[in-house]
Amino acid sequence: MSGFGGVKNVVVVGLGMTGLSVVKHLLKTTISLTIKVIDTRDTPPGHDQLPENVELHSGGWQQDWLINADLIVTNPGIALASPQLKPAIDKGIKIVGDIELFAWAVNAPVIAITGSNGKSTVTDLTGEMAKAAGVKTAVGGNIGFAALDLLEQDAELYVLELSSFQLETTSTLKLKAAAFLNLSEDHMDRYQGMADYRQAKLRIFEHAEVCIVNRDDKQTYPDVEKTLKSFGFDQGDYGCIEKDGIEYLAKNTVPLLAANELGLVGKHNIANSLVAIALLDAAGINLDATLDTLRTYNGLTHRCQVVADNNGIRWVNDSKATNVASTLAALSGLQLEGKLHLLVGGVGKGADFSELSPALHDLNLMMYCFGEDGDQFVSLDPRSLLCETMNEAIATLYPTLNKGDMVMLSPACASFDQYANFMARGDAFTQLAKQYSIES
């Protein structure tokens, strides 16, 4: 708890699941603290769960609280560049996030994953593999449980997904191993450019014993000398080799598992599996005990998930594809018998969607564009239709469906124009898929 030296007044900025986990954690410390919460929303989620001795200011900022704090704990959604935080920064007040508080408190090994795409799958898969090896494992961070809530599980190993937003306010997190999966354009509404975004991601390596990088994406390599292990589709530390005409996932030249035995489909999931293997190997976990999980694991909800399959028509929920690279990954692994009915759109976060054009050109498809930035997709391909909502898009495409077709939601955008989050968007798609499948 060394980070709390001299701290008496703490201001938590942003409530919700993460903010509540911070308040709960602070109340458990042995130090006597005055805790106050600021949330710009009029009725922030979780406000009714705050204890009476924690004061809440909602509906705007409270500058007096901020400049008189000893420590400010910000929600990942609050950028450090926010002008409201500048007076506190200028005054030298320490600003951290929930992951930094986790770093001060954790007393078991931690491994962590970041990247533009695939990090949720790798985090979840790594956790499942560790559990299969008999290790008491807690999984969370930017996925599932807030990191501070995981401490209650008293785990032997913590597996964290970390976003660039979380890493901005994290500086002392010691990791047995850290993986930087890939880097592609995302969150350009938050960062000044790709270099700025990359630097936020690279913070994951600051105190990592082993840094796992992507041989096919040199942007994932740290700028300073570190202990590196790499993954890729060629032979290397962790890669692919061919033996007797069969492709294997391998550690150096040692085959571990045939690629066709993986429960996950798509080339990108070979890479995801290699990262999980590399992380667990670095953490000293017996790989032999984990490989069966690779055979049975079939992925996350909202990530290339078949939610309905009726009359030869498959409905695929890929709502977690909130950027262009995620949608490109989904399209690259498709096996189509008929036409693809692709649903795209939402909040584009300043992204350049033109990268999708070559992938779209090679597919038998019709694209339905909806949401705040749906109009930005229409010019990418002449086989496009602009709709107000996803409901309207599905009602429009449904009468045209034939056996062998696929309806895929892979929006390449954030969801918060029309939905609370990507999960709510995926749930809405799943409900519509099941409804229309019954009717067909």
UniProtKB/Swiss-Prot annotation:
Name the UniProt record assigns to this protein: UDP-N-acetylmuramoylalanine--D-glutamate ligase
Source lineage: Bacteria, Pseudomonadati, Pseudomonadota, Gammaproteobacteria, Vibrionales
UniProt-listed PANTHER family: UDP-N-ACETYLMURAMOYLALANINE--D-GLUTAMATE LIGASE
Family designation: Belongs to the MurCDEF family.
Family annotation (Gene3D superfamilies): Mur ligase, C-terminal domain, Mur-like, catalytic domain, NAD(P)-binding Rossmann-like Domain
Keyword Metal-binding: no
Reaction(s) catalysed by this chain's protein: UDP-N-acetyl-alpha-D-muramoyl-L-alanine + D-glutamate + ATP = UDP-N-acetyl-alpha-D-muramoyl-L-alanyl-D-glutamate + ADP + phosphate + H(+)
Protein role: Cell wall formation. Catalyzes the addition of glutamate to the nucleotide precursor UDP-N-acetylmuramoyl-L-alanine (UMA).
GO biological process, one term: peptidoglycan biosynthetic process
Main subcellular location: cytoplasm
Domain of life: Bacteria
Gene Ontology molecular function: any one: ATP binding
Enzyme class: ligase
Primary gene name: murD
Species this chain originates from: Aliivibrio fischeri (strain ATCC 700601 / ES114) (Vibrio fischeri)
EC number annotated for this UniProt entry: 6.3.2.9
InterPro entries attached to this UniProt entry: Mur-like_cat_sf, Mur_ligase_C, Mur_ligase_C_dom_sf, Mur_ligase_cen, MurD
Pathways involved: Cell wall biogenesis; peptidoglycan biosynthesis
Places the protein is found: Cytoplasm
Residues noted as binding ATP in the record, renumbered to the chain: G115, S116, N117, G118, K119, S120, T121
Pfam families membership: Mur_ligase_C, Mur_ligase_M, MurD-like_N
GO cellular component: cytoplasm
Alphabetical keyword list: ATP-binding, Cell cycle, Cell division, Cell shape, Cell wall biogenesis/degradation, Cytoplasm, Ligase, Nucleotide-binding, Peptidoglycan synthesis
